[in-house]
């Protein structure tokens, strides 16, 4: 029982792992995932473009190798989804534009894929909205946990935010040392 989750570029890594290795994961969560590298280059500026076109990365611009940029963009790989997936995005995210994630969502729908998603509308916190130490973010994390638990079937699932927060903040207890 292995699930995978990540946010931002980690969300992109989550998606690409689910698409390329579907039998390795029971489920996945992608939070504010980088979803379309080509679209992203259009709004992130020349520094971001320089990272991708550098010889140690892709080594070419999208104009020189659009196929490679599509291969590395989850929105262009949507047909590969076989694993239960939850996606979150936020319309006021200044890092990963929600239109990029909406492209992924529309691509998954066009492929007839079964998945869950939520587009948060101007939720406080922008890019980090569900990772902040606030009651609203804790409630969102509990929803993410419940989605994952549905497939991972933990022996003692959390019943509420209080239990989730207790586990998150409980000091590690070393035994046998």
Feature-to-residue mapping (PLM):
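Active-site-proximal cap/loop segments of hydrolase catalytic domains
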Residues: 1-177
């Amino acid at each position: 029982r292995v699930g995978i989750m990540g946010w931002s570029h980690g969300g992109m890594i989550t998606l690409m792992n689910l698409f390329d290795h579907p039998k390795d994961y029971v489920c996945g969560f992608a939070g504010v995932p980088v979803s379309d590298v080509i679209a992203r280059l259009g709004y992130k500026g020349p520094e971001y473009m320089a990272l991708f076109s550098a010889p140690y990365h892709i080594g070419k611009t999208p104009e020189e190798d659009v196929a490679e940029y599509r291969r590395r963009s989850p929105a262009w790989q949507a047909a590969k989804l076989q694993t239960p997936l939850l996606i979150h995005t936020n319309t006021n995210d200044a890092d990963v534009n929600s239109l990029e994630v909406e492209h992924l969502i529309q691509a998954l729908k066009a492929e007839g894929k079964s998945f869950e998603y939520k587009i948060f509308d101007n939720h406080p916190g922008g890019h980090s909205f569900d990772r902040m130490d606030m009651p609203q973010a804790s409630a969102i994390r509990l929803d993410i946990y419940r989605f994952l638990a549905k497939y991972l079937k933990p022996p003692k699932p959390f019943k509420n935010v209080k239990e989730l927060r207790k586990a998150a903040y409980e000091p590690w207890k070393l035994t046998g040392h």
